């Protein structure tokens, strides 16, 4: 009886172990499928990671290209600044040249104005000298006229004196004639007295008359000569007076002309003085303008110098920056080229790997799809297996409880029942055992079919994945347990052995 109990316990333990092994196999198959799913998900994550790395490399390449463009833009900007610097320098140079040209023109204009002013001053001096000469000539002519008038007046006075003397002499002669007549009368009166005295007086009278005639003739001739001379002198005086009048009129006309010319010259002088003042004002304005221009030119030169220094400094700094940037750009281009080469090699490798991975992923995807299509009909079975496993686990727990209860009750029965009852109970247990064996054989056949399906699916999956795992039939081959059929069937135990 003890051997039967131990055999039943061993059988229950064997069945329980087989059931647990079956559950473990189902769990391993489910875990393997989950592992395959996780591997495929990991492969997809790796593919996404590779895509992200490719995208990062593309972004890095775009950043390097944009940085290269920025360097090119900075180079173009520096060239524009240099061109602007050159334009500013050329503009300042042109402005300085134009200002110097304007200053040269203004200087030449100022020289021309000064020359014209000097010519005007010379003309004014010449006009003043001509006017002075004309004044001196007029004064000389006036003096000559006055001296000539004085000479004429003195000659007229002399002639008048001579004529007066002649007239006085003529009056004296007439008076003498009257006296002579009186004397003749007296002589005639005295003739009577004395004949000698009369004759003497007559002779004397005759002599006196002859002398008087001579003197009268001389006086008459002198008077005629004086009259002729007076007439000539008067004619000459008239001619001279006419000439003087003509000369005076011409001189007056010339004086008027000279006055007009003088007025004109004075006006010209005034205009020239005004023009000189204007020129002086223009000169002052030009000098102030020149000073302003010189100041502006100086400021421009200073600003140009400052700008040139600033531009040189900026240019040198920009050139240094450009040199540094070019060196950095060269270094970065070299690094970038090396990195590009490395990245290109990596990209080539990655592209090759990605291509291989893509091909492999496509292959795995196709295999997965095929596997999924193939395992899709079995998914429900796997789910059913999982549910059945859970149910079996639950049933195992319940069976364990029932077994413990049955063991307890069986121990109680064996301890409290008689032999007949024990035999009946053993027969009942045998029937239940045979029934359980038939159920176990059914479950084994189902489990074998499932194992075959799982092994086939696992083989296809391993073949698709190229994975070599342990051989499940060999791993699950337990020669000492379920894989060995009993050579002799179980016999009924001897009920009398107890």
Swiss-Prot record:
Residues 420-430, 442-451 are annotated as: Hyaluronic acid-binding. It is found in: Cell surface; Cytoplasm; Cytoplasm, Cytoskeleton, Spindle. GO terms for biological process: cell-cell signaling; cytoskeleton organization; hyaluronan catabolic process; receptor-mediated endocytosis. Glycans are attached at residues 262, 302, 483. Signal peptide: none annotated. InterPro entries: HMMR_C, IHABP. The modification Phosphothreonine is found at residue 488. Residues 150-331 are annotated as: Required for interaction with FAM83D. GO terms for cellular component: cell surface; cytoplasm; spindle. One of its GO terms (molecular function) is cargo receptor activity. Keywords: Cytoplasm, Cytoskeleton, Glycoprotein, Hyaluronic acid, Phosphoprotein, Repeat. Receptor for hyaluronic acid (HA). Involved in cell motility. When hyaluronan binds to HMMR, the phosphorylation of a number of proteins, including the PTK2/FAK1 occurs. May also be involved in cellular transformation and metastasis formation, and in regulating extracellular-regulated kinase (ERK) activity. May act as a regulator of adipogenisis. Interacts with ANKRD26. Interacts with DYNLL1. Interacts with FAM83D/CHICA. This is Hyaluronan-mediated motility receptor.
């Amino acid at each position: 009886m003890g051997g039967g109990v131990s055999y039943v316990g061993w059988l229950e333990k064997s069945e329980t172990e087989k059931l647990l092994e079956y559950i473990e196999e189902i769990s391993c198959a489910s875990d393997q499928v989950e592992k395959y799913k996780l591997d495929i998900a990991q492969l997809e994550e790796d593919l996404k990671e590779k895509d992200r790395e490719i995208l990062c490399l593309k972004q890095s390449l775009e950043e390097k290209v944009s940085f290269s463009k920025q360097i090119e833009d900075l180079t173009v900007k520096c060239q524009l600044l240099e061109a602007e610097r050159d334009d500013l320098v050329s503009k300042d140079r042109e402005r300085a040249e134009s200002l110097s040209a304007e200053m040269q023109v203004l200087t030449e204009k100022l020289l021309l104005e000064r020359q014209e002013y000097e010519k005007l001053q010379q003309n004014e001096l010449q006009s003043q000298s001509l006017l002075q000469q004309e004044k001196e000539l007029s004064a000389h002519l006036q003096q000559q006229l006055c001296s000539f008038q004085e000479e004429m007046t003195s000659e007229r006075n002399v002639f008048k004196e001579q004529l007066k003397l002649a007239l006085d002499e003529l009056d004296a002669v007439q008076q003498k004639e009257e006296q002579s007549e009186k004397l003749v009368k007296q002589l005639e009166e005295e003739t009577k007295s004395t004949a000698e005295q009369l004759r003497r007086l007559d002779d004397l009278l005759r002599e006196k008359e002859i002398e008087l005639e001579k003197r009268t003739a001389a006086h008459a001739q002198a008077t005629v000569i004086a009259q002729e001379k007076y007439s000539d002198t008067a004619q000459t005086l008239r001619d001279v007076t006419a000439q003087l009048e003509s000369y005076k009129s011409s001189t007056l006309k010339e004086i008027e002309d000279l006055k007009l010319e003088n007025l004109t010259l004075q006006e010209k002088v005034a205009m020239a003085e005004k023009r000189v003042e204007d020129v002086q004002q223009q000169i002052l304005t030009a000098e102030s303008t020149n000073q302003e221009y010189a100041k502006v030119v100086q400021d421009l030169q200073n600003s140009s110098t400052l700008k040139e220094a600033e531009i040189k400094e900026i240019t040198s700094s920009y050139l240094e920056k450009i040199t540094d940037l070019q060196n950095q750009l060269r270094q970065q281009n070299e690094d970038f080229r090396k990195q590009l080469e490395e990245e290109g090699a990596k990209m080539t490798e990655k592209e090759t790997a990605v291509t291989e991975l893509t091909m492999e992923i496509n292959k795995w995807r196709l295999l997965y799809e095929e596997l999924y299509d193939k395992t899709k009909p079995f998914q429900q079975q796997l789910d059913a297996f999982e549910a059945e496993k859970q149910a079996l686990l639950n049933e195992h727990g319940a069976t364990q409880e029932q077994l413990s209860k049955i063991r307890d009750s069986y121990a109680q029965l064996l301890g409290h029942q008689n032999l007949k009852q024990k035999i009946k109970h053993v027969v009942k247990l045998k029937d239940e055992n045979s029934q359980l064996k038939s159920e176990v054989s059914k479950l084994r056949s189902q489990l074998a079919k499932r194992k075959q399906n799982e092994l086939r699916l696992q083989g296809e999956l391993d073949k698709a994945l190229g994975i070599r795992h342990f051989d499940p039939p060999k791993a699950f081959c337990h020669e000492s347990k379920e894989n060995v059929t009993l050579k002799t069937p179980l016999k009924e135990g001897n009920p009398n052995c107890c």
